[in-house]
Structures are given as C-alpha cells and as structure tokens.
Regions:
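A beta-strand-loop signature enriched in Asp, Gly, Thr, and Trp
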Residues: 75-77, 82-145
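Flexible C-terminal active-site loop/helix
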Residues: 149-209
Length: 209
C-alpha cells in the first residue's frame, strides 16, 4: 500500500500491476484496493507476461471490464495472438502485445494484420531506429505504448528520444524502472514526465539531466 501511495504522490497517472502469478481472487482484491486508493482515477495496466490460458484470460477480461483498466498486457504466450484477438472482441478492455512485438519484424507482422489493441514497443531491442520510426508512423497514436527493456539510464534516454521523435505520446510511457538503477550513479525522476501528453520536446528531456 505504501508503495502505491508513494507513486500517487509522485504524480504517476497510470500504474502497472503484474497478474497471473498468484490466486485469482487474491490478485483481484489487490486491484480493488488500488482502485479504492486512487478513487478510480488512475488507469491500471495489468501484465501477465504470457502466463495465461484462454479460460484465465477470459476471466481477467470479465473482471477488468468492471474496473478502470487501460489494457491487459500479453495475457497469453507469443503465438497465441489470434486467440487473444478473438477474446478481446467480446470485451471493452483492450489487450496489448508485448513479447509478441519485441522485434521490428514482429511489429510489422501484427501491424500489417491490423491488430486491434495496443502495441508495447521497446525501442532498445526492437531494431533499426529509423526503420522503427517508419513503422510507427503507420500506427494510430493511441495504439502505441513505449516501454523500458531494463536498459541503463543511458539506454533509456535513447529510447525516450525515439518516443519523442515518433510523436506517439497519447498513452503514458512504461519507463517507471529508475529505482532499479540507483547504483548506476545516475537517475531520473521520470514519473510525472512520462504521462499522457507529457513528452513535450527533446529540450524538455534534456532539462531532466
């Protein structure tokens, strides 16, 4: 509880929660508690890291439809994208591909197939910077979320500069990992900066260093 209260205090406007690791009812209670703490004003992203089957994914989609959930990220394993797409059609909550679109070729494949949900893009591992920017140009603004791949702060700065250049800034960015790199001797308080419409320009980003 204290951790989430701290994040709210830092100005975070979106939270990511890992699901699919514990008892379903227990995880639902955790989500409900966070919704209560934020008075339902903070959209929640749920990340299952591809651990679920169809039945469990459907169960979570039913639950998420009653909560302020922005999307459920990669509930099923890579290779199960069409099954995920079929499930998503029955619910208002969006599904996001993460592991399924780690690399540029995968992103192109599902972009060409017109995936109807969200793409979680990790610039540090996706591939060619310019080719990635070209591919992102084809996607609707609200279909892209940029995310950390646990790179150092130097790597994160390069990823963030690509996010700014792409212009896809509708959704909050998933770079809330700075606490993992405090021993690097450099850190950025990225929380409020990485919210919807929070990335103004490269000049704004440089001011953080």
């Amino acid at each position: 509880r204290n951790r989430y209260e701290k994040l709210f205090g830092q100005g975070y406007q979106s939270l990511k929660i890992k699901i699919g690791k514990s008892d379903f009812a227990e995880e639902c209670r955790m989500v409900d508690a966070i919704v209560d703490m934020s008075e339902g004003k903070i959209p929640i992203r749920m990340d299952a890291n591809g651990t679920m089957d169809r039945a469990r994914t459907t169960r979570w989609m039913e639950f998420a439809s009653e909560c302020p959930v922005e999307f459920i990220e990669q509930p099923m394993a890579k290779g199960m994208e069409r099954e995920m797409s079929a499930i998503a059609r029955d619910f208002p909550v969006k599904l996001a591909l993460d592991e399924s679109v780690c690399f540029l070729d995968d992103l192109k494949r599902w972009s060409d197939s017109q995936w109807e949900g969200v793409y979680v893009v990790k610039p540090s591992i996706a591939g060619s910077r310019q080719a990635l920017l070209d591919e992102l140009e084809k996607l609707p603004e609200d279909s892209v979320v940029f995310s950390s791949s646990l790179e150092s702060m130097v790597g994160a700065s390069a990823a963030l500069s690509l996010a700014i250049e792409s212009g896809k800034q509708v959704r909050a960015l998933g770079f809330g990992v700075e606490d993992l790199f405090l021993k690097d001797g450099a850190s950025l308080l990225l929380g409020p900066f990485l919210q919807p419409d929070g990335l103004g320009s490269m000049e704004d980003f440089e001011d953080l260093w």
